[in-house]
């Protein structure tokens, strides 16, 4: 239920009565605005987030401003798939920009374009959840002969992780696992699949926040070595540099880059 994430039942009832939004923050540099789709409407909610984004820069900068629309459901309330993220533009060049500058197409599925403020993204499509995101990934594989398809399956985080819905999380994992053969069937000999995460959100842990644990790096491709143990990497950025080296043939010379490619370990 929404109230478990953004405050008390009274807070939401007051918002429904007055039309005022609910504003809250979290530890991972996020400023969030929640409002009723029926009472406030999506255009007004998005407008408020755009205003907040312009304010929350520099000394008061936060990584993302997030629009959190919700609707009534039974006796309570539920978030909808009309969330929007308004991110700071990346301060330095990133792998997506390097790829785009080299003419490599980068397609975002889900909130990827929002997270990177559109930086380096050539095409993007919104999704309504995991099932839709998986299908749109397959759709891009049909229409994009080469490049990077970058997909975010948001239900693991928003719908099940934060809500500590262990059964829902388990069912979502099984759905993803059952879907993978469809993805494998569309992969060419040159394609590489990387399954990872940007943080933990353990549905069995106390509270509702992200959880701290090492993320997985699961990779599959017909041209990869089998059973390679990559060990514990020093940074999440290693994945990005590996993608960059594979698609460009070499890593871009960038003295500020913190990632290190492990492509030679898997090819």
Region locations from a protein language model:
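Active-site regions of oxyanion-processing enzymes, predominantly non-cytosolic
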Residues: 19-22, 63-65, 137-157
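Extended, H/D-rich, highly charged conserved domains that either
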Residues: 35-36, 43-110
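Beta-strand elements within well-structured catalytic alpha/beta cores of enzymes
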Residues: 99, 147-155, 180, 191-200, ...
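A glycine-rich, aromatic-flanked flexible loop/lid motif
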Residues: 106-118, 144-159
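A long, amphipathic alpha-helix that forms part
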Residues: 134-141, 156-191, 204
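Substrate-binding rim/cap in mid-to-C-terminal beta-strand-loop elements of soluble/periplasmic
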Residues: 209-249
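Polar, surface-exposed loop/tail segments
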Residues: 249-267
